[in-house]
Structures are given as structure tokens and as C-alpha cells.
């Protein structure tokens, strides 16, 4: 049996960490599993490198959402299956909607009978559930809700952050609000729920529903035009033996958060990944200007040079985002006396707004 699942979910919902935990768990306990990282920037995504450093069989599809590259996705899946992989999971960009139609129906129509599609899976973190339950409203609520409307399977992630009663309460609410989907809770950190997720993907199939989500309509376009993407890859030469890579990542994330907040913008997800030639690496995440910076993985030893990948998605005009993040990288790198060599940089708006 060969299964393929799309993991949708808003920025910071835990798609990458869940895919890493799931593929490692499934490979250990059941059969070979692999993951695909997908985003709009060029090659060298932070998520893909992080997955590989974490020991996963991982690859990436870049420059386009997998919604629009069915042929490339199909070729990748066929290659994995030929190598004996029974489960492949891929995310989509964190602001993406419409993958149920474009990916699942696209594959089934272009390659009838060739791919066994697992339940269309949407991850949601507790913070997002709390926001939706509060009915406070927000500029990106259309995306948050629409992703869940598409789901066959809703995965409440990061359940280690909640009491068991709160987990049950959130699951009840999700099932009531989105009755066409099953809902389960998992923790990529502790491993809770990974067996249930593995079994759900392998033993169930996609419903192939086509809910009306207003794709391409005015609300969709208004939401998308607020979003911008930033991708940066660089090499940093370290001058001093006492360089602290973890402090550098924290300070850089803090500086970007401060700059974004001062500009009256929001950054739902910033990913900072750095690694040394010796194989040691560190990763920092920022999931919004009002939230603490998370050190997902820490350097364990000093290093003399770093490769750094920065990926960010923000509700901010792209030209402004470019200036804010680029200036922060220069300021903090100068403070740490790092000599930078920029390999690539991209910054663009989903609506090309100024």
C-alpha cells in the first residue's frame, strides 16, 4: 500500500515538526515514510534542511505551491514508491487554501487510480483554536477557518501545552464546528497521538469533498494581498572563539520581532536555521510579535562558521518587510562581528503590494 497525504494548516501550526515526528515514527514502527517540504521560495528551504538534519528522508518542492505542479509532485511520489516508501506526506505554504481541489482532485483526474490519497489533513495549534473560539475576528480569519473547512482529518497539534481537559474541550469544539472532519490530538514533542495519526492516514482515504471556500473571491484576495514572503541564505564567518550561536539566533529573531511590531505589522512565522560544518545546528522560531521566541534545537558547541537560512511570512508590505529583515540581519551580525556572504535573497508580496 502506498499512501500520500497533504498537511495543510496555518503558519506555525506545527506542520514541519509533525511531519518529522510522524515520518520517523512510522519508519520505525511500520514502514518507510518520507516528507516533502513545499514553499514559494527557491531551493534551500529551512524546513527541508531542518528535516534532513533531524534524520528524516526529506526533499523539497520549491518556487510554486504543489497545487500548481501536479506533474512534478507525481514524479516525486512515483520515485519514493519505487524506493519502497509506503507513506509520503507533504505540506503546503502556511497561508494556502484550495489544495484539496488543486492537489487531490488534480492528481485523481490527471493520474486516475495511480495514487491512494489519505485523508486531507489540516493541523491547528491551540493558540489558533483559542482565537477562533473567542470570535474576536481578525484580518486572517478567512484563511484560518477555510483551511479547517477543507479537512477530512483535523490534527490538534502541540497538545503537550494543554491539560487533558483542555485537549478534550478543544476536540469537542473542533468536531462541532467542522462536523465533516475527524479530530485527533498529537504532540510531536512527546510522541502522543502519533500512532493514531499514522493509522488514520494508512487505513482511511480522502473523502474528496469539494466544499465552497470562495477560492479566488474578494475575501480570499483581500487576505492574500496582505501577505509577503522573505527568504535569505547566507554564510557567516565567525571571528571569535566565544561566539554563541544560540544567542545569535535569539537576538536576530528578537530584532526582527521588534522591527515588525514597530512597523505595525505581524509575522505569523519566522524560521531561523543555522548549521556548522561539523553537523551541529540550531533552530529558532517566532510565531507572532506577541509570542516568545522558541529555540527548537540548540547548538551544543562553539563554531567558527555558519550556514544560515531565514524564511519568514508576514502581514506586511513586501518592500517594507525586505528593509526591516535585511537591516536586522546586518545589525545583529555586525554586533556579533560576523562576516557575511549572501547566497540568495527573495522577498515578494502575494499581491505585489507596496
Model-assigned labels for residue ranges:
Residues 1-8, 12-17, 203-354:
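P-loop NTP-binding site
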Residues 2-8, 13, 17-142:
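Nucleotide-state-sensitive switch-loop elements of NTP-binding domains
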Residues 3, 69-72, 99, 140-147, ...:
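Helical mechanochemical/support elements of P-loop NTPase systems and associated helical scaffolds
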Residues 25, 43, 79-83, 106, ...:
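Conserved, well-folded catalytic cores of nucleic-acid-processing
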Residues 35, 183-185, 342:
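A structural preference for short, hydrophobic beta-strand core positions in alpha/beta folds
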Residues 47-54, 168-175, 324-329:
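Short, aromatic/basic amphipathic alpha-helical patches
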Residues 65-68, 190-194, 279, 348-351:
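A short acidic, often aromatic-flanked loop/helix-cap motif at beta-alpha or helix-coil junctions
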Residues 141, 145-155, 159-222:
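Canonical P-loop GTPase G-domain recognition
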Amino acid at each position: 500500500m502506498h499512501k500520500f497525504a497533504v498537511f495543510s494548516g496555518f503558519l506555525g501550526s506545527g506542520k514541519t515538526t509533525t511531519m518529522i515526528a510522524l515520518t520517523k515514527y512510522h519508519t520505525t514502527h511500520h514502514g518507510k515514510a518520507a516528507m516533502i517540504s513545499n514553499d514559494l521560495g527557491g531551493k534551500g528551504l529551512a524546513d527541508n534542511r531542518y528535516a534532513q538534519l533531524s534524520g528524516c528522508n526529506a526533499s523539497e518542492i520549491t518556487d510554486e505551491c504543489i497545487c500548481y505542479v501536479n506533474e512534478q509532485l507525481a514524479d516525486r511520489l512515483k520515485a519514493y514508491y519505487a524506493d519502497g516508501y509506503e507513506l509520503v506526506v507533504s505540506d503546503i505554504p502556511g497561508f494556502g487554501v484550495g489544495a484539496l481541489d488543486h492537489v487531490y482532485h488534480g492528481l485523481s483526474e490527471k493520474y486516475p487510480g495511480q495514487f491512494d490519497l489519505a485523508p486531507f489533513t489540516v493541523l491547528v495549534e491551540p493558540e489558533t483554536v483559542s482565537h477562533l473560539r473567542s470570535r474576536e475576528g481578525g484580518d486572517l480569519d478567512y484563511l484560518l477557518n477555510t483551511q479547517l473547512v477543507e479537512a477530512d482529518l483535523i490534527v490538534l497539534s502541540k497538545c503537550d501545552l494543554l491539560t487533558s481537559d483542555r485537549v478534550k474541550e478543544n476536540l469537542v469544539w473542533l468536531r462541532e464546528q467542522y462536523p465533516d472532519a475527524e479530530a485527533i490530538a498529537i504532540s510531536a514533542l512527546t510522541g502522543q497521538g502519533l500512532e493514531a495519526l499514522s493509522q488514520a492516514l494508512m487505513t482511511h482515504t480522502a473523502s474528496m469533498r469539494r466544499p465552497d471556500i470562495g477560492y479566488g473571491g474578494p475575501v480570499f484576495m483581500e487576505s492574500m494581498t496582505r501577505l509577503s514572503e522573505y527568504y535569505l541564505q547566507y554564510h557567516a564567518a565567525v571571528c571569535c572563539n566565544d561566539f554563541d550561536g544560540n544567542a545569535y539566533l535569539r537576538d536576530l529573531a528578537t530584532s526582527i520581532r521588534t522591527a515588525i511590531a514597530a512597523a505595525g505589522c505581524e509575522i505569523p512565522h519566522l524560521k531561523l536555521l543555522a548549521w556548522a560544518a561539523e553537523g551541529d545546528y540550531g533552530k529558532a522560531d517566532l510565531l507572532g510579535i506577541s509570542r516568545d521566541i522558541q529555540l527548537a534545537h540548540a547548538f551544543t558547541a562553539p563554531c567558527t562558521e555558519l550556514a544560515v537560512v531565514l524564511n519568514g511570512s508576514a502581514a506586511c508590505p513586501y518592500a517594507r518587510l525586505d528593509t526591516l529583515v535585511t537591516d536586522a540581519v546586518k545589525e545583529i551580525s555586525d554586533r556579533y562581528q560576523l562576516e557575511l556572504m549572501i547566497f540568495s535573497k527573495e522577498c515578494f508580496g502575494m499581491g505585489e503590494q507596496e
